[in-house]
UniProtKB/Swiss-Prot annotation:
Entry keyword Kinase: no
Residue positions the entry lists as glycosylated: N48, N54, N63, N77, N147, N168
Reactions that this protein is recorded to catalyse: Random endo-hydrolysis of N-acetyl-beta-D-glucosaminide (1->4)-beta-linkages in chitin and chitodextrins
Identification of the protein by name: Crh-like protein ARB_03382
Active-site residues, record numbering mapped to chain: E125, E129
Extracellular side: 26-302
Sequence ranges on the Cytoplasmic membrane side: 324-365
Membrane-protein topology: Single-pass type I membrane protein
Length: 365
């Protein structure tokens, strides 16, 4: 019931997030456990999870907000079509340390930002970000408990073809360190003690968020617009970020995560045993095809079906034969009637001709 309540609340607040500025919507939290004691427990993933984004996303697993996510054979396209579009998907499940691997192609365009965000309700955050005016670079960043007093935590790395080709971007997150990988190559490591002695180290249960947003929208702050490469040109839409595969590993096995106090320390998080409703939804087998259903039928049922089909075929053939015979008989009767009428007409003509011959006398006879 707690997980269901949380999903309902997140869905409702997802609509509210659509009304916020793109920056706020990307980092939205609806109940901060550092400020409130009655926040609902976080439903755990509690397992490994892989999904290919070339089919519709399960609405019981993912919350889509603030724009259109278009599905294609190659994956999901997060598209900015108009002002303030910032299509984003956010998992309903939470992971408490683990691995997030995303195969994606970032969007190009001045003022356009593509992002992968691992974020908790206390605003712990681990980021990948691409600025559309920098086609061969990717930025990594982190925040602890919403602390934005300093923006010197980010590091930028070269990545050829980030906006032309799909690449593998992976975060490995443990209580001791965070590692960022590009195409399986380690590019950055952040140790716990390096993040202000651990105070700014992301360490609380987090959702996974993928999205694109107009960092260069005129409504954003000047500093954000400058960081995004300048004002976005909405006349040049669409701007598209594409994702084809996502792998998530939760380091813990459990049903829910709860905060035992307001410290925000990972040691204060309780792991509640069980399996979450979301995990059950993920593990639910897909609908079976007709071929699979047929193979699973017992032999007696198959024989009965074949017999029924055979009976229907025989009945159909009998009906067709009956109709043919009936039609042929009707045709014969009609032909007989027409033939009798023809003979009668011929006899009448011959009789009239005989009478005429008897009455006709040649001139001079």
């Amino acid at each position: 019931m707690m997980a269901s309540r949380r999903i309902s609340v997140l869905s409702s607040l997802g609509l509210f997030a659509c009304l916020l500025s793109p920056v706020v919507a990307q980092t939205f939290t609806y109940c901060n456990p550092l400020e409130k004691d009655d926040c609902p427990n976080a439903p755990a993933l509690g397992q490994n999870y892989t999904t290919y984004l070339n089919s519709s996303l399960n609405p019981d697993v993912w919350n889509a907000t603030s724009g259109l996510v278009e599905i294609s054979d190659a994956g999901s396209n997060f598209t900015i079509h108009k002002a303030l579009d910032s299509p984003t998907i956010q998992s309903f499940f939470y992971i408490f340390f683990g691995t997030v691997e995303v195969h994606m192609k970032a969007a190009t365009g001045r003022g356009v930002v593509s992002s992968i965000v691992i974020q908790s309700e206390v605003l712990d955050e681990i980021d990948w970000e691409w600025v559309g005016s920098e086609p061969d670079k990717v930025q990594t960043n982190y925040f602890g408990k919403g602390n934005t007093t300093s923006y010197d935590r980010g590091k930028t790395f070269d990545i050829k073809g980030a906006m032309d080709d799909f690449h593998n971007y992976t975060v490995n997150w443990t209580p001791e360190k965070i590692e960022w990988y590009i195409d399986t190559v380690l590019v950055r490591t952040l140790k716990y003690e390096e993040a202000l002695g651990g105070k700014n180290f992301p360490q609380t249960p987090s959702t996974v968020r993928l999205g694109i947003w107009p960092g260069g929208d005129p409504q954003n702050k000047k500093g954000v617009i400058e960081w995004a490469g300048g004002e976005i040109d909405y006349e040049k839409t669409p701007y598209i970020m594409s994702v084809k595969e996502l792998k998530v590993v939760d380091a813990h096995k459990g049903k829910e995560y709860s905060y035992s106090d307001r410290s925000g320390d990972w040691q204060s998080i309780k792991v509640i045993d069980g399996v979450s409703d979301i995990a059950n939804e993920i593990n639910k087998p897909p609908p079976k095809s007709l071929a699979q259903r047929w193979r699973e039928l017992p032999t007696a049922a198959k024989i009965a079906i074949f017999a029924s089909i055979g009976g229907l075929v025989i009945l159909g053939m009998a009906i067709i034969a009956f109709c043919c015979v009936k039609q042929r008989r009707a045709g014969r009767r009609e032909f007989s009637m027409e033939n009798s009428k023809f003979v009668e007409d011929q006899n009448n003509v011959m009789a009239m001709r005989t009478q005429w011959n008897h009455k006709y006398k040649p001139v001079g006879s």
